[in-house]
Amino acid sequence: MRAGRCAAALLLLLLSGAGRAIGSEDIVVGCGGFVKSDVEINYSLIEIKLYTKHGTLKYQTDCAPNNGYFMIPLYDKGDFILKIEPPLGWSFEPTNVELRVDGVSDICTKGGDINFLFTGFSVNGKVLSKGQPLGPAGVQVSLRSTGADSKIQSTVTQPGGKFAFFKVLPGDYEILATHPTWALKEASTTVRVTNSNANAAGPLIVAGYNVSGSVRSDGEPMKGVKFLLFSSLVNKEDVLGCNVSPVSGFQPPDESLVYLCYAVSKEDGSFSFYSLPSGGYTVVPFYRGERITFDVAPSRLDFTVEHDSLRIEPVFHVMGFSVTGRVLNGPDGEGVPEAVVTLNNQIKVKTKADGSFRLENITTGTYTIHAQKEHLYFEMVTIKIAPNTPQLADLIATGFSICGQIAIVRSPDTIKQMSKYRVVLSSQDKDKALLTVDSDAHGSFCFKAKPGAYKVQVVVPEAETRAGLMLKPQVFPLTVTNRPVMDVAFVQFLASVSGKVSCLDTCGDLLVTLQSLSRQGEKRSLQLSGKVNSMTFTFDKVLPGRYKISIMHEDWCWRNKSLEVEVLEDDVSAVEFRQTGYMLRCALSHAITLEFHQDGNGPENVGIYNLSRGVNRFCLSKPGVYKVTPRSCHRFEQAFYTYDTSSPSILTLTAIRHHVLGTIITDKMMDVTVTIKSSIDSEPALVLGPLKSAQELRREQQLAEIETRRQEREKNGKEEGEEGRARPPGQEMVDELQGPFSYDFSYWARSGEKITVTPSSKELLFYPPSMEATVSGESCPGKLIEIHGKAGLFLEGQIHPELEGVEIVISEKGASSPLITVFTDDKGAYSVGPLHSDLEYTVNSQKEGYVLTAVEGTVGDFKAYALAGVSFEIKAEDDQPLPGVLLSLSGGVFRSNLLTQDNGILTFSNLSPGQYYFKPMMKEFRFEPSSQMIEVQEGQNLRITITGFRTAYSCYGTVSSLNGEPEQGVAVEAVGQKDCSIYGEDTVTDEEGKFRLRGLLPGCMYHVQLKAEGNDHIERALPHHRVIEVGNNDVDDVNIIVFRQINQFDLSGNVITSSEYLSTLWVKLYKSESLDNPIQTVSLGQSLFFHFPPLLRDGENYVVLLDTTLPRSQYDYVLPQVSFTAVGYHKHITLVFSPTRKLPEQDIAQGSYIALPLTLLLLLAGYNHDKLIPLLLQLTSRLQGVRALGQAASDSSGPEDMKRQTKKQKTRRT
C-alpha cells in the first residue's frame, strides 16, 4: 500500500518507562511519520536515522514495508536531526528535518507527522566525442517524456561527458543534447525508468568542435587568405562545413599529410572550421594576390582538438604598386570632372572628364582620401591600401547644394521687417529639422544635403507670425538626386474671410466681429441690418493667423455664437451663424431628464432634455408658455412647473426624495414579503407583499392580452363567419414559469436616510438575511438591494447493512465544530434538514466496534464493517513482563504507538480488516521478532508474543552544587574510551538534578563528564570526570559537584595624601559613558582606604574620580581619576592628592597689571581730556567687573572643575 494514500492522526501515549523511575528522563517521546510515494518503491531499502546536532547517531530504524511508516523513540530532550537515507540516486523531500524537542511544543510531543516524500529516481548517461571514450563538459542535456514537447529537466555535462537527472518518476523518456556551436552526430537517446535508477540506452555523440583563427597584415585584418587543413588520423568524411575542393597553385609541403579541406578568411581576418572531430591536425596558410603570392607566417601550424572548441594561436601575418579610382555624382552615377582628390592631405590630383584618377607609388598602409567640387560634397574616407586592392572603391558625392530666395511684398504695420530669416531643411517623411541656415540681407540661402526627398520651410519669427506675416508655400518640396537644386522660392500671402447669418424670423440689426486670437488688440466689426432672414458678410485683406468671429444677440440661441477660423494658405469662406431658438435657464439640485411642451400646441412640440446638476441653459424653439415636467429617479417639490419666454427667469427644481430599487432572487416561486425600516423616526416601517415575481407579472400580462384578443374575436365573430367562431380558444398558450424568479420592489428615500430591508418566506432561506443601505441623495441610488433566496437542503442517507444507533455528524465544510448530530433509526436510515443549500457539508459516521466507509457514488450512505483486535505480550528473556516498550502498529489509514504497562501486555482493538506492520522499540533492548507483517480478518482477535533481550545498560547519577542543592538543566555526557571511543551518549539533568545515560555498551569504559556546550552557567565540575566500566548491570551513584559562575566584582582603593585633607575628600564612581551622574559615592572620613559595594562582573567600563571641597581660590590641585573594566573578580586602585596653598602676593600682582593701563590713560588725558576721561571711566568699570568674576569663579570651583579637568586629561587605565 502506498504511503501517500495514508492520512490519519497519530495516537501517541506519553507514559513512564521501565526500570528505575527518576523523573522526566524516562518519558518517551515518539517521533514518527511516513515515507510517502506516489509510485511503487521498496520501503525496506530505506533507513531513518536520528543524529545529535553534532553528528552522533542516536537511533536508526527502517520503514514499514506496507506503507512506509516509521517510529523513533526519544528518551531525552534536546536538538536532533532526523535524516532519511535511501539508496544512492533516490530523491526525497525533505532530506532531513531539524528537531528541537522540548517536551511541550515540538512536533514530536504534539504528535505531528514528519513525512518524507519520494520525488524520483536518477537517470545517468554520457555525451562522448566521436571515436573517444570521453566527452566534453558544457553540453546542454534535457529530459522530456516520450512524445511530449516540453522538457522536464535540463542539465549540463561534467568533465568527461557524464550527466545525471534526479527526481525522475517511472516512465518512458527521451534525452536530447544541444550545443550552440558543436555538431552532434547522436543528439537523442531514450531511457525507461521502472522501480530503480536507470541508465540511458546509449551515449550521445558530438561529431566535432569548431576551430577558428585569424590573419592580419600590418595589424589590419586580411580577407581572402586560404587555410588548408591536413591530418594523418582523421577521415575526410568526418569533417563538416569545410570546402573540400583542391586549391589551385598550392604545392603540399609534406607528402605524408592527407589533405582534408580549406577555409578562407573573412573581412575581419577570421577563418573557422565548423566541425572537426577530436584528433591531431596541421593547418597551412596560402595567399596569392593579383600577380604575386605572399608569404604568411607561420607557414605551418600543428594543433590538437580534444573535447572543446579551439582558438588557433598565434595570429597569422601576411608579410611583403599604382592604384586607380573614380569620383562619381552618385551610386552608378556619372563621373565628376575637375574634382580635386587629396591623399593624406598632401598628394592632390584632379579627376579626368570621366571622373577617374590614378595614385602612384603606394605602399601597403592606411590612407585618408578626400574629394572636393563646388556645390558637391564628399565624405573623407579612410581605407587600407594593400596589394589585393589595386582598384579603390569609388568616391561618391554624399551631398549637394540646395539654394533659394525669400520675397516679402509688404511687412505688417506693427513690426519692423527683419533683415534675415531662418530656413529649415527636413526630410519629407519626418518633421525633425536636418539643417538650419539664415538667409542673407537679400533673402538668399543655401543648404548642403545628401540625395533624397526634402522639404524647405522658412521660420517666421513668432512676432511676425502674430502680426500676420505668412509665406507661400509654407513647405517647398524638392528631390536631390545627383546635382544641386537652385530654384527654391517663397512669397508673402494675404486672404479674405466671408460667411452668412440665418435667422428664425427677421434678422433686424446684428453686429459681426472679427478678432485676432494671435495678435492682441486687432479687432474689426461689421454692422448688418435687414428685414430678411438671411444676410452675408466679408472681411478683406486678412493677414494669416487665428481669428474669432462672433455675432451679438444674448437672448437668442445660436448653433454657434462664435466661431474660430484659421487663415493659413487659402481664403476662408462658408462661415455661418444660425439662430436655433430662445434661451431658457434652469437651476437643478440633481441631474434629471426634463420633459416639456407648449400649452395649446400638439404633441409635435414636446421636447426632452437630459440636464446636469447646477445651472443649465437650453433653447426653446418657439416663444410662449411651457409646461415643464421632471422625469428621474428623484422626486421634486412639484410634479410639474411652468415657464413663460416673455418673462425670462431661472427655473429652480430641488429634489426631496430618491428612488431606491431592490430585488429578491429565488430559485423557487414562493411567498415573499419585504419589510423596510427607516433610520428616520418619523418614517413608519413599510411592509411590501406578498410580492409577485417578474415572471408572474409577465404571465398575468400575457393572460390579459389573450383575454382581450378573445373578447375581440367574440365581438367580431359575426363578421368572421362560422368557421372563425368555431376556432378553439386553447390555441394561444402562455409561457411556462421558469426560475430563477425575481421579486422587484422600490422605496422613495430621503437624503441621508438609512434603510434596513428584511425579506421573509415560509420555505426559503435568504442570503444575506437582511441588508442595509444608506441613500446619499447625490445621484440615482439605483438597485442597492439584492438578496438571494434558496430552498432549504435536506440530507438523507442509509447504513448498509441496516444498523441502528450509528452517530451521524453533519458539519459545514472547514468548520471546527459539528453543526447537527443525529442517530440512525432501526432501519439504518437518517434525514437532516432543512439546511442552507449554498454551503458545502461533510457527513461523518461512527459507532463503537465498527468501521464505516462512504459508499462510492452516493452522498450520505455508509457501509459498516465489524472491527478486529490484536494483543501483544512482551516479555524479557527471563519470561518476566517487560514494561516501557514502545510498540508501533500501522496499516492502511491506521497507526498507533503505545507503551507497555507493568504486565507487558498491549491490546489494539477496533481494527479494520487488512494487513498491519508492528515493530517493538526500547533503548538497550533488541526484540524477536524485531518487526513483522500480520493479516487481520474481520472480527478476528490475534495474540502475539515478543521477547526482549538486554543489549546495553544505563548510568544513573546526580549533579548538585557544593551545598547539596540539585542543579537542573546541566548537560552530561558519557564519552567512550580506547576501543569504544566511537561511542557516546548524552542527557540533561531534571529538576532534582538526576540524570540517566542510556545505551552504554557492556565491556566499555566511559568518562562521565559535563558537556562543553550548553553549560555556560557552570564554571567547573568536581571531579572533572568520573570513570565507569560497564558490565552486565546498570551503574549507580555517579555523582558530580558543580560550581556556578560568580557574577560579582569587588572594588577597593586607597588615597595618598595628608591626613588634614581627608575630611574634604570624596571618591565617586561613574560609568564611562555618563560622567555627569555618579552611580556610587563614598566619603573617606578619617581613613585612607575606601571600598565600594559589589559591582556586576559585566565587562563595562568605569571611571573613579577623587573630589574635594577645598576652594580653588586658596589651593592649587589636580583631581586624580582612574578608569577600569569590570573583568575578573577584584580591582584595587590608588589615588594621589597633593594640593598647594596659593600666596597672597598674587592679588597684588593682579592689581599691578591693571595699574599700568590706568597710568597710560592718565598721561593721555592731559592731551585729550575731553574725550578720554569718559572712555577711561568706562574701561575701569569693566576691568573691575572682570576681576570680581574671576574671584567668584575661583571660590566656587569643585565638581564642575573636576569635570572640566576630566575632559582635558587623558584617562589613566590600570
Swiss-Prot record:
Keywords: Coiled coil, Endoplasmic reticulum, Glycoprotein, Membrane, Phosphoprotein, Signal, Transmembrane, Transmembrane helix. Residues 1205-1214 have a biased composition (Basic residues). Residues 692-720 form a coiled coil. Residues 1-23 form the signal peptide. The modification Phosphoserine is found at S1196, S1197. Residues 708-726 have a biased composition (Basic and acidic residues). Glycans are attached at N42, N210, N610. The keyword Lyase does not apply. SUPFAM superfamilies: Carboxypeptidase regulatory domain-like, Starch-binding domain-like. Pfam families: CarboxypepD_reg, Ig_NOMO, NOMO1-like_1st, NOMO1-like_2nd, NOMO1-like_9th, NOMO_12th, NOMO_3rd, NOMO_5th. Residues 1168-1214 are cytoplasmic. Residues 708-733, 1190-1214 are annotated as: Disordered. Disulfide bonds: none annotated. It is found in: Endoplasmic reticulum membrane. GO terms for biological process: multi-pass transmembrane protein insertion into ER membrane. One of its GO terms (molecular function) is ribosome binding. One of its GO terms (cellular component) is multi-pass translocon complex. It is a single-pass type I membrane protein. The chain crosses the membrane at residues 1151-1167. The keyword Thylakoid does not apply. Residues 24-1150 are extracellular. InterPro entries: Carb-bd-like_fold, CarboxyPept-like_regulatory, NOMO-like_N, NOMO1-3_2nd, NOMO1-like_9th, NOMO_12th, NOMO_3rd, NOMO_5th. It comes from the Eukaryota. Component of the multi-pass translocon (MPT) complex that mediates insertion of multi-pass membrane proteins into the lipid bilayer of membranes. The MPT complex takes over after the SEC61 complex: following membrane insertion of the first few transmembrane segments of proteins by the SEC61 complex, the MPT complex occludes the lateral gate of the SEC61 complex to promote insertion of subsequent transmembrane regions. Component of the back of Sec61 (BOS) complex, composed of NCLN/Nicalin, NOMO (NOMO1, NOMO2 or NOMO3) and TMEM147. The BOS complex is part of the multi-pass translocon (MPT) complex, composed of three subcomplexes, the GEL complex (composed of RAB5IF/OPTI and TMCO1), the BOS complex (composed of NCLN/Nicalin, NOMO and TMEM147) and the PAT complex (composed of WDR83OS/Asterix and CCDC47). The MPT complex associates with the SEC61 complex. This is BOS complex subunit NOMO1. It comes from Mus musculus (Mouse). The gene is Nomo1.
